[in-house]
Amino acid sequence: MALGGVFMSDTDGNIGTSSTTSTEKVTGLLFDISKQAKFFEEGAGLAVKDKLQGNVIEINSMDDLKELGITAYSGDTEKDLLFGIPYYHINHFFGIQGSAGRLFIMFADCGVDWNAIEQMQRAAHGMINQLGVWTEQSLWKQTDPEAETYSIDLVTDLQSKAASLADENAPLSILLCANSAVIATAEESVKKVELGKIPTCVINARFVSVLLGQGLDADVSAMQLANPNLTPVGNIGAALGCIASASVQESFAWVNKFNLIGYFPDIEMGFGDVTLNSEDKLTSTLKYSSLNKIQLDDLDDKGYIFLCKYSGLESGVFFSKDQTCSNGDYRTVARNRTIHKSRRAVRNALLPYVNSPLKVDPSTGYLSSAKITMFQNIVSDILTTMQNNEEISGFSVTIDKNQNVLKNDTLIIKYSLVPVGVASRIEVVEGLALTNK
């Protein structure tokens, strides 16, 4: 038999279509430098090579960045590490989630695989709950010029890595911010994105969410333009900050709680037509105001998360939803965070009982009623705390009394959570009447 332990798995398909701990706020941010061939060989990267190359760094506040050589955008490509983009996102993260926290960062070449994610989770002892991936790899590909839509491969690759980590009891939610401005092809990359060809990213990938959009301001435009790859700066830092500050059951798109106007005075997509015009500026980065409701609804229906505005809220910028690339039970980041929290807590509570004696009923050979009650109480106590803190609506714990633990040395415990709902849509019917009755 394999090595003993407590092994967790979850089920999908059961539903259809705020207490906090330090661990649920632990966050990771991976910068994929595979498109920066000389990142650690020249300029700012060379200056910090010994500190950053191959290392996972824990940052607890903005004060830690100076020593690491991570500085704000200045316009000097010799001094700005990755064009100031890392500082921009880390600053957003701590600005939103609080001045102190736990953020693990890494700069790694992920052109061949995403093993850096596993390395980061190991360095954090499995405690990273949400991980942002900023990459210059193209989000969309055009393998067939005659195809009606682009293809999307990054989501599948990241889902596979996250699923593997979940099997190792280190589950996390991945937020992907990739190069949406340049379409990868078999030959020369295409710098013009056709909105009608954007594919759905809902491909049964519950651990991954795809982010689009960025701030519309001079520094963001300058950072994108300074990068030869023209990769959008994105909004990954703000998204991670919102998630880290939210309770596990809360959507980071909650309008009343996560207004980002202080970080994004105006917004754009960051893609469209990034060929240079006669003024050496990007031709079009699709201002949010230039997109109509049909186009925005289409992006939402295809599973993307983007910065948005609501009519009537003049001073407001928000994330559109907290959806994942799945339409199953775990179709939101909040639901994944909730089940991940329960998994970690239940597993930690049960680990002391691995290889412990299990008293059986001598008349049946099955698990004794006392032991069944004991294990039910262990799990129920944890889930009751979550319910009292309104992180879940309810739960059930089941232990089959007819388990033959003498035969297989295995105890099977099942629990189900009733999640907290979310008001993604509020529909109101209005009209006139002759009376108020």
Question: What is the predicted function of each stretch?
Answer:
Residues 1-206:
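Small-residue-rich
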Residues 21-22, 211-216, 402-409:
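Short, ordered beta-strand-loop transition motifs
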Residues 68, 93, 345, 349, ...:
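Residues that form generic nucleotide/phosphate-binding pockets
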Residues 85-86, 338, 375, 411:
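Alpha-helical structural motif
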Residues 103, 108, 392-437:
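Compositionally biased, low-complexity/repeat regions
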Residues 170-253, 258-264:
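Long, hydrophobic alpha/beta structural blocks
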Residues 244-371, 414-437:
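Long, contiguous, structured domain-core segments that constitute the functional module of a protein
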Residues 360, 364-416:
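C-terminal structured domain segments
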